[in-house]
Structure formats: C-alpha cells, structure tokens
Amino acid sequence: CIRDRTSQVDERVRGKELPDDVFQESLEYILAHEIGHCLGLMHNMAASDAFPVDSLRSATFTQRYGTTPSIMDYARFNYVAQPEDGITQLTPKIGTYDKHAINWGYRWLDVQDPHEELPTLNAWLREHENDPEYWYGEQSREGIDPRSQSEDLSNDAVLASTYGLKNLRRIIPHVTDWTSEEGKLQYEGGRLLMAIVFQWLAYADHVKTNV
C-alpha cells in the first residue's frame, strides 16, 4: 500500500524493490503500533480526524506530528501530500493521544486504595475533553461515526480523497515504467494497478460514510 499512496512524492518507492531505509521507516511505525497494543492500547480510528488537510500538506507540520495524533490509528501513509509540498515525513508518529493514554494508564499515584485515583484520572480526562487530539474512536465496520474510519486522513474526507485521487492519476501512467523488467511477466505492475483500484475504492468509501 505504500506505493499507491506515496510514490507521487517519494521516488524511493518507485522501483521494483523497496530500499532498506523505507523498510526501516515502516518497521519503526509498525513496531510502535504493536507495542502500543502490548501496553493495552486499542485502535483509535478517530485520531486522524484531529488534523486538517492543510496541515497534512505542510512539511514542517508533518515532520513534527506525522499523519495523526495516535500511532494506534490506521493512518499509515500521507496520501494527501502533493509533489509540490516537499513532504518527507509520510508515516505516523507517537502522538498526543498515545502519550496521554499511557500517562493515564500507567502514571504512579501514591495512594493506598485504587479508588482514590479516580478524581485525578477523571480530572485528566476533563482537562482535554474538547481537544480532538485526545479523542478516542473505536474500530468499526459499520461506519456509524465518519470520524472513526480505517485508513483515512484528516477531518475532511472529501478534500483528502480529492487529493488522493489526484495522486492516483499521477501514478497510473508510470505503473509499467516503475515496475517492469525486460523479459519477465508484469507481476509487480499488476499488483500496483490492483492496489490503485482498491485505494480508489477506499477513497470513495471514506466519502460515502459521511453521507
């Protein structure tokens, strides 16, 4: 899924094989996500709704914050980024929500009875209840809450998907150039083309859930 979402801005993923540095960047994100599960964190599909589209097109913003306030979201790659944006940070980072959730769950409070922790814990929640970077949205197949979607970005599904479609149109003419090997079957090209089709469907689904 990395090629169909980022090859419009990242030349490293256009070849027939992904280079080691791309694997390392992806592995760092995956490991952080899975360690979050080991620490008790659930998927937080609402996190990416906290960031506006314009921020995801900012090189300085994405370099600092990534694509979502939570590594537990499925906001794997910045498909909003356009070639002229100069963005190099295309993957998520450990964010505001993650640090807050770990602090809430693991911070030692010097009390004898666990129930004595509740006033402090509840106060921490109330302190940030109106800040979308601290919101939680569970994973759901029904699409009841359009903020909590898998593989989406930003708080504007229509605009984000529009940018995503623009990028797919940029990638399609190069499918053969970027994947073919002389004298061999076009297996990688076929895989990339199918990934593009499924990504198009994902963009449409993100918008449909808002209707």
Region annotations inferred by a language model:
Residues 1-4:
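Conserved small/polar residues in nucleotide/adenosyl-binding loops
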Residues 6-9:
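A solvent-exposed, charged loop/short amphipathic helix patch at secondary-structure junctions
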Residues 11-31:
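Short pre-active-site segment immediately N-terminal to the catalytic Zn-binding motif
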Residues 29-44:
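Active-site recognition of the HExxH zinc-binding catalytic motif
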Residues 48-211:
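Conserved catalytic/binding loops enriched for acidic/polar residues
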